[in-house]
């Protein structure tokens, strides 16, 4: 069954270019590891929900926007194996990949794909 990783987090609007470069680099890394597709998105519209919202979920601050990233895998097993290998990469271990966002406010999870139209 297809599997999707979903990441949501805040990024300073002024860091759009830095985030785009980071997203491209991570996209290449995950595709090389076996992902079927990677989609990175720059936020533009975050309406308030009745009980929660994207903005409150990531504790959005003034001057920030929200980014999302969707990584599609053939299966959860493929994703788990790929992430285990990616975490062994020198760049991932050395911290040489600066992350242009506040990692403490990122939310993420894995989802079984139920359908696509």
Name each model-derived stretch.
Residues 20-26, 82-90:
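Short amphipathic alpha-helices in soluble, non-transmembrane regions
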Residues 24, 41-44, 70-76, 111:
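Bulky hydrophobic/aromatic packing residues
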Residues 15-17, 77-79, 116:
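Residue-level signal for secondary-structure boundary sites
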Residues 4-11, 49-86:
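Short, well-ordered beta-strand segments in beta-rich or mixed alpha/beta enzyme
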Residues 5-40:
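N-terminal first-folded block
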Residues 31, 35-62, 87-117:
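Glycine-rich beta-strand-turn "strand-cap" elements at beta-sheet edges
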